[in-house]
Amino acid sequence: MQQLAKDILASLETKMTQAQEVMLKNFCDIRTGTANPNILDKITVNYYGAPTFLKTLASISVSEGNQLNIKPYDSTLIPNIKKVLLASNLGITPQTDGLVVRLVFPKPTEERRKALMKEVEQLAEKTKVAIRNVRREGNDKIKKVELTKDLETFYLNQIQTLTDKNIKLIEKHTTTKNTELLKA
């Protein structure tokens, strides 16, 4: 029975970590005025009839802090890349010079920064709720396992400690992202 409780605890830790990873991935999608190649992770380009991730078709580099340079390994892809970037919801018009596609990220206005910070706070709150739901699920499972009262209390405390640790990490990541937005 104690092994089952340990397995439940390990499962909860995995779920909480996954919730945080999703939040961090979503944080990467929030533009801060600085160029971040991760913003192109979900972009696919039609390459010989198959949708292929842009990052596998081109070298992506940051220059001047606010500019992404996309240099495709096959220069015939430039029109396709430009078309896909225009259709994406990046809100940036790509520029080309024949060999390289450039994305210049403008500095966000004060109003836009506040809106982005609000979005960061909402993502963080959703993640905290997800972690609390995982905690509740874990508490219910532990209570169903036939353990002594002392062991049950021990595992419930472990779950609470794990929850607190993850909530603190979320707050730390949120503060970091908001600081990044303020500096933009």
UniProtKB/Swiss-Prot annotation:
Protein name as annotated: Ribosome-recycling factor
The UniProt keyword set, sorted, is:
Cytoplasm, Protein biosynthesis
Membrane among keywords: no
GO molecular function terms here? ribosomal large subunit binding
Q: Name one Pfam family in it.
A: RRF
Compartments reported by the entry: Cytoplasm
Q: Identify its protein family.
A: Belongs to the RRF family.
> Coiled-coil stretches, from where to where?
none
What PANTHER family does UniProt report for this protein, alphabetically? MITOCHONDRIAL RIBOSOME RECYCLING FACTOR PSEUDO 1, RIBOSOME RECYCLING FACTOR
Q: Which domain of life is it from?
A: Bacteria
One cellular-component annotation, GO: cytoplasm
Organism of provenance: Onion yellows phytoplasma (strain OY-M)
Entry annotated with the keyword Kinase: no
Q: Which gene encodes it?
A: frr
In terms of InterPro entries, this protein maps to: Ribosome_recyc_fac, Ribosome_recyc_fac_dom, RRF_sf
**Protein function:** Responsible for the release of ribosomes from messenger RNA at the termination of protein biosynthesis. May increase the efficiency of translation by recycling ribosomes from one round of translation to another.
For the biological process aspect of GO, one term held by this record is: translational termination
Query: Where does the protein principally reside?
Result: cytoplasm
